[in-house]
């Protein structure tokens, strides 16, 4: 004979948001569960601009691998590629390729969102400015001030968006 414990509250989940970039990649990890959302860690992974492209991509891979081993996320959110300037877009696309490969090596399949989807999820307006999104992140995570740097704040916003869209 056995008993089954059925609970309406989901187990806590560590959700990692990633804001891709070659020079600076933002990351933000939250703990989500019945008690709400709590920040775990956030910051940036940087690659020196004076290094060659292969060296920068290797640094991104190694540092992200280490971060994944430390944080052990259950879910990952990733910003979809957004076109800025052609040169910048190519570098971000190369970084995204490394990010996707690194996630796959850690058996993680990211959920992807456009910047407008993230803004809509946090503020209710898909064209909200950076300040409004950062204020929403601070409010949702009960932070005493706006999260910095901007890339880390964006990554936290992506992680929160994963949580908001968990049943869609």
From Swiss-Prot:
Q: Which GO terms describe its molecular function?
A: crossover junction DNA endonuclease activity; DNA binding; magnesium ion binding
What is the enzyme's class at the highest EC level?
hydrolase
**InterPro entries the record matches:** RNaseH-like_sf, RNaseH_sf, X-over_junc_endoDNase_Mg_BS, X-over_junc_endoDNase_RuvC
GO cellular component annotations of the record: cytoplasm; Holliday junction resolvase complex
Q: How is the cofactor bound?
A: Binds 2 Mg(2+) ion per subunit.
Pfam families, per database record: RuvC
Cite the entry's keywords alphabetically.
Cytoplasm, DNA damage, DNA recombination, DNA repair, DNA-binding, Endonuclease, Hydrolase, Magnesium, Metal-binding, Nuclease
Q: What cofactor requirement does the entry state? A: Mg(2+)
Which Gene3D superfamilies does UniProt cross-reference here? Ribonuclease H-like superfamily/Ribonuclease H
Q: What is its EC number?
A: 3.1.21.10
UniProt-annotated location(s): Cytoplasm
> Which residues make up the binding site for Mg(2+) 2?
79
Its subunit composition reads: Homodimer which binds Holliday junction (HJ) DNA. The HJ becomes 2-fold symmetrical on binding to RuvC with unstacked arms; it has a different conformation from HJ DNA in complex with RuvA. In the full resolvosome a probable DNA-RuvA(4)-RuvB(12)-RuvC(2) complex forms which resolves the HJ.
- Family under the similarity heading: Belongs to the RuvC family.
In terms of PANTHER family, this protein maps to: CROSSOVER JUNCTION ENDODEOXYRIBONUCLEASE RUVC (PTHR30194:SF3)
Protein name as annotated: Crossover junction endodeoxyribonuclease RuvC
């Amino acid at each position: 004979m056995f008993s089954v414990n059925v609970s309406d509250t989901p187990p806590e989940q560590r959700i990692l948001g990633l804001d891709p970039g070659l020079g600076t990649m933002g990351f933000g990890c939250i703990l989500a569960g019945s008690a709400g959302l709590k920040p775990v860690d956030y910051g940036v992974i940087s690659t020196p601009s004076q290094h060659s492209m292969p060296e920068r991509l290797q640094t991104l891979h190694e540092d992200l691998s280490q971060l994944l081993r430390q944080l052990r996320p259950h879910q990952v959110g990733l910003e979809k590629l957004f076109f800025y300037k052609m040169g910048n877009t190519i570098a971000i696309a190369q970084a995204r390729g490394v990010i996707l490969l690194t996630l796959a090596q850690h058996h993680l399949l990211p959920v992807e969102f456009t910047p407008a989807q993230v803004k809509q999820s946090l503020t209710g307006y898909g064209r909200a400015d950076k300040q409004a999104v950062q204020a929403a992140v601070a409010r949702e995570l009960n932070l005493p001030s706006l999260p910095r740097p901007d890339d880390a704040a964006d990554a936290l916003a992506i992680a929160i968006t994963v949580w908001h869209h968990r049943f869609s």
